[in-house]
């Protein structure tokens, strides 16, 4: 279905954008629910190439879906080759291409007569590579070095968008920051007293073991722990075991719009990241999402998380890898209704004022229109 309603507003030409990912889930909140949605709402047409079959989902009706293989662990080249084919086939039909994975730099390099290409930098690529369990330790330093070279080349030949201000230091020039904000609802329900939630990717480095331990500690107090998100292969067996024992609820992957509804009325939202290089500079999106839904945040002390929670007094900061402290924070918020309501309300007000996606969406769309050669 073409999302075209574009040229009615006084000469602004409709842009056709090709968006590609082989790493992210097709329902990724940043890619689909924020960026693509903003382009479609502005009257542009989007073809979205992503691993639909591999992830067991259908393309939304408001994009043209193209199926790609998923780049999983070491099987990345087949996915990159497939993306390169799509890119070559469509290069004459689209005005602009947006790629979301460093791997896809290899899909666009050296293709002649290509439209402008935008790389949306989601993470600290060199630091992230040191976290990949499938990459042997001896390969990590040379791969990190190659990643830096690749980033330098990308900056010379492509347009860049950054998900974090903190990533700017890796590049020579200034680039537009499109922050990981969220849709902040017009009103929210006050936080309840019997359920804590975790929303996001689940892995060891993101605190999956601590979350399970917290659930065990809270069982006698009848506070349920609900995890929502895709888990990496290393964590799945442990999670399945915990679910079988009745320790917690794990809802696996849910589309972002459905997952966010699960935050309403929770007692608190958890962010249990470990102290890893990739997490030091990035703003955990889930914290903004918890605040946007009016629930207090319980987070480990990664610098950006502390900055948010302490600035707005919207939750509790707990030590690294300390399930007992997390459980105590949950019980403190459960027992002190005034404090729970106040922290939830302050977080909501701050999110509404400072982290509401439509405010950034306008800048994002205008920048893409400019790169596609359209005057808005």
Predicted regions: what they are:
Residues 30, 206, 255-262, 269-291, ...:
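Nucleotide-sugar-dependent
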Residues 37, 84-91, 106, 119, ...:
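Membrane-proximal helix-turn-helix segments that form the acceptor-binding/catalytic region
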Residues 17-18, 188-216, 225-226:
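Conserved donor-binding/catalytic core segment of Leloir-type glycosyltransferases
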Residues 19-78, 90, 167-169, 230-232:
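N-terminal strand-loop element at the rim of the active site
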Residues 236-268:
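Nucleotide-activated donor-binding/catalytic signature segment of Leloir-type glycosyltransferases, i.e.
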Residues 261, 338-369:
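A charged, aromatic-enriched C-terminal amphipathic alpha-helix characteristic of glycosyltransferases
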Residues 54, 224-237, 252:
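Glycosyltransferase donor-sugar binding loop
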């Amino acid at each position: 279905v073409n999302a075209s309603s574009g040229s009615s507003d006084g000469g602004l030409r409709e842009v056709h954008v090709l968006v590609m990912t082989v790493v992210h889930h097709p329902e990724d909140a940043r890619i689909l629910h924020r960026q693509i949605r903003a382009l479609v709402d502005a009257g542009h047409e989007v073809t979205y190439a992503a691993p639909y079959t591999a992830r067991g989902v259908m393309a939304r009706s408001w994009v043209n879906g193209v199926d790609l293989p998923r780049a999983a662990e070491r099987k990345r080249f087949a996915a990159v080759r497939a993306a390169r084919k799509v890119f070559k086939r469509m290069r004459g039909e689209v005005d602009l291409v947006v790629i979301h994975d460093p791997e896809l730099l290899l899909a666009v390099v050296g293709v002649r007569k290509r439209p402008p290409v935008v790389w949306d930098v989601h993470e600290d690529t060199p630091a992230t590579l040191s976290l990949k369990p499938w990459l042997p330790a001896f390969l990590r330093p040379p791969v990190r070095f190659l990643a830096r070279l690749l980033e330098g080349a990308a900056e010379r030949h492509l347009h860049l968008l950054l998900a974090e201000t903190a990533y700017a230091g890796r590049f020579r020039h200034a680039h537009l920051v499109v922050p990981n904000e969220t849709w902040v609802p017009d009103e929210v329900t006050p936080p309840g007293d019997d359920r804590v939630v975790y929303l996001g990717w689940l892995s060891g480095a993101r605190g999956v073991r601590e979350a399970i331990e917290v659930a065990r500690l809270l069982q006698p107090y009848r506070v349920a722990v609900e995890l929502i998100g895709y888990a990496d292969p290393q964590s799945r067996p442990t999670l399945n075991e915990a679910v079988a024992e009745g320790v917690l609820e794990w809802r696996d992957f849910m589309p972002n719009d459905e997952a966010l509804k699960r935050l309403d009325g929770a007692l608190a939202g958890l962010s249990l990241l470990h102290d890893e290089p990739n997490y030091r500079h990035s703003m955990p999106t889930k914290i903004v999402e918890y605040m946007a839904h009016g629930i207090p945040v319980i987070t480990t002390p990664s610098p950006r998380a502390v900055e948010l929670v302490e600035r707005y007094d919207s939750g509790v900061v707990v030590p690294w890898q300390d399930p007992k402290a997390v459980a105590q924070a949950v019980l403190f918020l459960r027992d002190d209704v005034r404090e729970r309501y106040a922290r939830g309300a302050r977080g909501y007000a701050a999110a509404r004022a400072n982290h509401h996606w439509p405010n950034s969406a306008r800048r994002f769309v205008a920048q893409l229109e400019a790169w596609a050669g359209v005057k808005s």
